[in-house]
């Protein structure tokens, strides 16, 4: 595997995660394909398109405060111009005065476009959320 492609894909994922955690949702737009698909937990539905995708991040950032956030077990696989990145996450946040604990695995698919990795598909797997 081309290690530089792998490292650049991992860097794109870090950039996306840092931007939304810092509330800079608009910064995600250039890193997300216009027709990105996000599958909801347990595959109960999906959204398609950058506008709807970013709206979910915007809603969370406007209405929740992250108190703790951790990632581990990141795996980055690259084949040609496609990268699949997964990682476990754990987060504690407050929304509408209530404190929540959530954990699971995030799965992102990236496609190389014009020498940059662009997110094209996302699913949140094994997600568990409960009052904290």
Give the location of each predicted region:
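A solvent-exposed, acidic/Ser-Thr-rich amphipathic alpha-helical stretch
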Residues: 6, 10-12, 25-78, 100
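Short helix-adjacent coil turns
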Residues: 16, 20-24
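Generic short beta-strand segments
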Residues: 35, 87-93, 125-126
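Hydrophobic/aromatic beta-strand elements that line small-molecule binding cavities or substrate pockets
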Residues: 57, 71-76, 89-91, 105-111
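A short, structured loop/turn motif at beta-sheet edges
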Residues: 76-83, 110-116
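Short, cysteine-centered beta-strand-loop-beta hairpins and adjacent loop/turn segments enriched
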Residues: 91-101
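Short beta-strand edge/turn micro-motifs at domain boundaries
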Residues: 101-132
